[in-house]
C-alpha cells in the first residue's frame, strides 16, 4: 500500500514563506508607488533596477541549481536537463535577451518579433528554432511531470504549493502586461513585482523539492516517490 508522503518542511514553515513573500510584494509596491520622481521610478523597475535584479538573480540561480542536479542526481538527470533548458529560456526571456539579436527588437514586443518587417529572416529563424525546441521540451516535461505534480498537490507538499503559486503570480504578471487598462505607471510597477516574485517562487520551489527528497530519504530509504524513482 502506498504510504502518503509527509510534507517537509511542516505546513507552518510553508505558510511563513508565503507570508514573507506577500509582505515583500506589498512593501515593494508601497515604496515604489510612493516615489514621485517618474525618472527615478523607471530606474527602479526597469532593466538594471533592483526589482528586476532580484528576479533575474533568482531565476538564473534556479537554472544553475537545475544544471548541478542534472549532474549529481542520476535518477532525475533527464528531468533536470529538461528543466534546465526551460529555465534557461525563462531567464533569457525575462532578461529581454531577444532585444540583443536585432537592433529593431527593442522597439517591438516578443509576440510581434516574428512579424517585424525590419528584423532579418535569419534572425527570426534562429530564434524560432530556440522557441520550437522550448515547446517540444516543455511538452515532454509537462507530460511526464503532470501526475507527479498532481499527486504532490494532493499531499500538499510545499514545493508543489510553491509551484502552483508561481503559476498564479506568473499569470497575473502576464495579465497586467497584456490588458491595456493596466498600461500605466502603476500597472508597470505591479507587473515587475509580479514577474520578480514569480522568479523567486521558482527558486523556492526547487529548494523545497530537494528538502522534501532529503527528508523522504531519511525517513524511508526504500520508498518510491511519485515519479517512480527510488528516493534513496
Task: Locate predicted features.
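Juxtamembrane "helix-exit" motif on the non-cytosolic side of transmembrane helices
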Residues: 32-42, 174-184
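Short aromatic-rich membrane-water interface segments that cap or initiate transmembrane helices
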Residues: 45-54, 110-126, 188-196
Amino acid at each position: 500500500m502506498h504510504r502518503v508522503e509527509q510534507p517537509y518542511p511542516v505546513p507552518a514553515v510553508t505558510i511563513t514563506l508565503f507570508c514573507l513573500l506577500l509582505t515583500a510584494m506589498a512593501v515593494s509596491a508601497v515604496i515604489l508607488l510612493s516615489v514621485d520622481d517618474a525618472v527615478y521610478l523607471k530606474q527602479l523597475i526597469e532593466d538594471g533596477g533592483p526589482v528586476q535584479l532580484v528576479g533575474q538573480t533568482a531565476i538564473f540561480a534556479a537554472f544553475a541549481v537545475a544544471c548541478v542536479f542534472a549532474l549529481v542526481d542520476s535518477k532525475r538527470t533527464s528531468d533536470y536537463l529538461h528543466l534546465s533548458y526551460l529555465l534557461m529560456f525563462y531567464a533569457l526571456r525575462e532578461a529581454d535577451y531577444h532585444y540583443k539579436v536585432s537592433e529593431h527588437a527593442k522597439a517591438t514586443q516578443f509576440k510581434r518579433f516574428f512579424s517585424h518587417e525590419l528584423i532579418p529572416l535569419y534572425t527570426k529563424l534562429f530564434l524560432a528554432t530556440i522557441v520550437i525546441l522550448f515547446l517540444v521540451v516543455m511538452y515532454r516535461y509537462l507530460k511526464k511531470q503532470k501526475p507527479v505534480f498532481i499527486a504532490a498537490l494532493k499531499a500538499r507538499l510545499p514545493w508543489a504549493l510553491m509551484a502552483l503559486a508561481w503559476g498564479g503570480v506568473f499569470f497575473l504578471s502576464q495579465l497586467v502586461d497584456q490588458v491595456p487598462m493596466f498600461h500605466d505607471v502603476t500597472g508597470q510597477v505591479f507587473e515587475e513585482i509580479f514577474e520578480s516574485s514569480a522568479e523567486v517562487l521558482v527558486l523556492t520551489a526547487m529548494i523545497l523539492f530537494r528538502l522534501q527528497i532529503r527528508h523522504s530519504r531519511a525517513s524511508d530509504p526504500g520508498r518510491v516517490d511519485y515519479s517512480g524513482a527510488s528516493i534513496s
